[in-house]
């Protein structure tokens, strides 16, 4: 929006004021605009996530969410609400982002509102065993005290399930719905 726009006596057109919205995915091509951004709109956790390159939105619930892909993450949040729970966040990792499992888990563990965590992986192109390996390494390093419930389906899920059993002594629940119900129950 440009308002006002004036024409000077010598014929030049000058925008005296303007407002614009830049898409988050395009701002990386404009570092000067990114530096002048509005970090005051981000929560502390959101600012930390952004600095770490994570896709995170802080919410007011008590069930932590870690999933692969925006669609699955939003579905997980919807099912949490369906079962009477409240998601504490939106946080997705996947594909090459599995290397961010540790900063993602550190971020979730620093959220004092989270009473339980659901980790929901569904692989088509992304391999669930690779994503699960990253999460297992983060869990082994950070040793979280809160209950964690897994749902793992798709490409590499047999290997992922074996990794969870062998390394953490846990098995994912049979369905996404079962894992989410358990997480909602544990958070109550």
Residue ranges of each PLM-predicted region?
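ATP-dependent carboxylate/acyl-activation modules
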Residues: 1-2, 6-119, 129-133, 137-140, ...
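Short glycine-rich, flexible loops that bind phosphorylated cofactors or substrates
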Residues: 126
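Proline-centered loop/turn at the N-terminus of a beta-strand
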Residues: 145-147, 171
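Short glycine-centered, acidic/aromatic-flanked micro-motifs in structured strand/loop junctions
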Residues: 121-123
């Amino acid at each position: 929006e440009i308002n006002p726009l004036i024409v000077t006596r010598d014929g030049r057109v000058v925008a005296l004021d303007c407002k614009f919205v830049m898409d988050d995915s395009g701002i990386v091509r404009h570092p000067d605009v990114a530096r002048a951004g509005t970090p005051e709109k981000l929560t502390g956790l959101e600012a930390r996530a952004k600095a770490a390159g994570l896709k995170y939105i802080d919410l007011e619930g008590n069930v932590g969410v870690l999933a692969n892909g925006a669609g699955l993450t939003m579905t997980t949040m919807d099912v949490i609400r369906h079962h009477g729970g409240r998601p504490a966040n939106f946080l997705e990792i996947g594909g090459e982002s599995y290397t961010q499992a540790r900063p993602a888990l550190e971020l979730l563990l620093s959220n004092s509102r989270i009473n339980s965590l659901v980790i929901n992986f569904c692989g088509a192109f992304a391999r669930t065993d690779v994503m699960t390996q990253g999460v297992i390494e983060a869990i082994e390093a950070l040793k979280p005290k809160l209950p964690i419930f897994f749902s793992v389906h798709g490409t590499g899920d047999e290997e992922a399930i074996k990794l969870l059993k062998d390394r953490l002594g846990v098995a994912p629940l049979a369905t996404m719905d079962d894992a989410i119900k358990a997480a909602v129950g544990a958070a109550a």
